[in-house]
Curated annotation (Swiss-Prot):
Entries under InterPro entries matching the protein: FeS_biogenesis, FeS_cluster_insertion, FeS_cluster_insertion_CS, HesB-like_dom_sf
Signal peptide limits: none
Keywords: Plasmid
Matches recorded under PROSITE patterns: HESB (PS01152)
Pfam name, any one: Fe-S_biosyn
SUPFAM superfamilies in the cross-refs: HesB-like domain
GO molecular function, one term: 2 iron, 2 sulfur cluster binding
Family in the record: Belongs to the HesB/IscA family.
GO biological process per UniProt: iron-sulfur cluster assembly
Coiled coil: none
Protein name per the record: Uncharacterized protein y4vC
Native source organism of the sequence: Sinorhizobium fredii (strain NBRC 101917 / NGR234)
Amino acid sequence: MITLTDSAIAAIKFALSQTCEPADGLRIKVEAGGCSGFKYHLGLDSESRDGDAVIEAGGVKVYVDSASQPHVSGMTVDFTTGVDSAGFIFDNPNARENCACGKSFG
């Protein structure tokens, strides 16, 4: 369903190691919004919920709710760092268009 690059796995592991809240994975949710129609919402989570797809890769879990699953099927998640920014990058084959910021799609 979702592929994580080694960089994304390392970033998720780092985030999990820094949180004070109990968490063992990353939740990816697609919500209405952004300049192209949909946006990604990311957050750490401690458990799966009814209907979730649970993807395990490199020792981390990714939770995707049932409503978001069709929007992220086949997506690759990467993490990049630059001189002045760092963040997750989404290569989503379901996106017909992306906004300039790369966080919103339609």
